[in-house]
């Protein structure tokens, strides 16, 4: 069934909570098939993952110097994927976004994704930047020389899967001891770390005494706040209206333990006004 014109101008945003990586991959493939058939509009899946290392198409054995079994013994799975890029880490407290979108120019899409992340971070405080001119290994978003967001995508029949991961308040230690993003000396950072560092610098410059309890960030809780800003920024970057939808509207069954996508009938009727995301 063709999409109504109204839906063609929307970005559907779906919050999936915390999902195992392979279950999220199955959901992406399910939603991608629907998007390729024009049974739903461009869609942004937002979620977190339990600890996992994922390999992109350019990742090699050198990225995990101690071997995959060592990392699995520490409780971190290792999964090969069809996305671009090299090795990265996902874990609790990191915001992962999987846009399932019809695109024409993948390079423009990557640049727009970087710009959307930069804009969302700017609303929270850190001045982030792209290093796109320094080569493919520098794809992503940086605060100074520190990487705060990774990007890797796959395009099939004009529709994207995979996407971005922004370090919000996740543990950065798992990035140590691996070669993340193909950059042996890369320094990773997070939104929480940058906000904390900014407060310390402000205290040092004003001579104010350091407090055991730092002032609360502008919006709490941090991850939920940034997720809202990221969805708004991403929709705005693509000139689309964002609309919150449930997993069931996408034909996703999240009631079973595995959280796998099911081929349930898609509800293509316009979302009720109550589901509109305030922006």
Predicted features, each with a name:
Residues 173-235:
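A hydrophobic, small-residue-rich beta->alpha segment in the mid-to-C-terminal subdomain
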Residues 116-124, 225, 229-240:
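Generic non-transmembrane alpha-helical segments
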Residues 1-142, 147-148, 177, 201-210, ...:
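N-terminal lobe of the biotin/lipoate ligase/transferase fold
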Residues 59, 155, 166, 182:
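A short beta-strand motif that forms part of the nucleic acid-binding face
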Residues 157-172:
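Conserved phosphate/anionic-ligand binding catalytic regions in large, soluble enzymes, centered on
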Residues 48-50, 155, 168:
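Residues immediately flanking
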Residues 150-152:
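Beta-strand scaffold of nucleotide-dependent catalytic cores
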